[in-house]
Amino acid sequence: MAEKTEKPTAKKLRDAAKKGQTFKARDIVALIVIATGALAAPALVDLTRIAAEFVRIASTGAQPNPGAYAFAWAKLFLRIAAPFVLLCAAAGALPSLVQSRFTLAVESIRFDLTALDPVKGMKRLFSWRSAKDAVKALLYVGVFALTVRVFAGLYHADVFGLFRARPALLGHMWIVLTVRLVLLFLLCALPVLILDAAVEYFLYHRELKMDKHEVKQEYKESEGNHEIKSKRREIHQELLSEEIKANVEQSDFIVANPTHIAIGVYVNPDIVPIPFVSVRETNARALAVIRHAEACGVPVVRNVALARSIYRNSPRRYSFVSHDDIDGVMRVLIWLGEVEAANRGGPPPETRAPTSAEPQARDGVAPPGDACADNAFPDDAPPGAAAPNAGSPDGGAPARTGDQNA
């Protein structure tokens, strides 16, 4: 059998919690309940009300009805004891729920005959937890003896003074001394409680330790094969809806960044002369948009500055291109129209001197950042030569033969 050396996983801890196997420092819960009761007793337990009831009965001298008399005492007892009991119950329930992380142990409620197995009972009798409880019991005996010794040294005068106290003060004095004794015992037992909680936490994780095979098997059951899951997740992320695919096919061009952003631009002068954003995707979906555009013959222009600017200034799909980006978009549309005119064998596009805001190309290669950076013609290109694909640096057939709206 493999040695269990691995720490329990989060799933292992959750499954154990459903079975009722959670970290439980019962003595800490008892400490909180006792401390709450000791501090609340002087305020909630009013013995003067009981004494006043006796005085009332004695002063009247009448024979009370036994039924009414018992009912009155029961009602008085509930009025005094109910708040005290409810407060102690809440003080005990809240720490228990916190320790179990508010997990309902459904499986532990079911009747289990294996709990009556004598072999398992003998194992529990001679387990590390049983040895821990035995040592803890001996330590508590020593703590109680120390508490009595310290209490006698501090409050012996008050204890012997009870014989000379007035009867009306006896109840109050007994409550005060009892509270002091309880709090002193809890203070002396605090080191034992901390040590018990630490050992209990160690034993709890020791019982839930796993071997390496269990860890691997649990990972396969919960996550599946890592390569298959990664591939499936990648394919799922790259799938485009039919609406986005249709928008890509109807776009005049796609401007990319070049792998993280894909912006589709559509212009229809019959509707409105201002171009608007038809596609707006990022990361894996942007890559899918680029691939689909190349497959459908839609030009893909890789322009980092323009793509980032449109993405920043047009926060959603189906919004108009901002005023700051219209110039760059129109330059791309004009260039695409010139490329398609050259591909149809028409006259070569007119050569014009670039403006100061438009960088010149050197040796037929467009400067970085230009919308046509990947599609420049060499100076000696013959008229009517086929232009490279707007989205492919290695050239080839034109991406689309339809007219571009400039």
UniProtKB/Swiss-Prot annotation:
It is found in: Cell membrane. Keywords: Cell membrane, Membrane, Transmembrane, Transmembrane helix, Virulence. The chain crosses the membrane at residues 28-48, 80-100, 137-157, 175-195. One of its GO terms (cellular component) is plasma membrane. It is a multi-pass membrane protein. Its main location: membrane. InterPro entries: BsaZ-like, T3SS_substrate_exporter, T3SS_substrate_exporter_C. Residues 370-399 have a biased composition (Low complexity). Residues 341-406 are annotated as: Disordered. Part of the bsa type III secretion system, is involved in the intracellular replication of invading bacteria inside the host cell. Probably necessary for the lysis of the vacuole membrane and escape into the host cell cytoplasm. Belongs to the type III secretion exporter family. This is Secretion apparatus protein BsaZ. It comes from Burkholderia pseudomallei (strain 668).
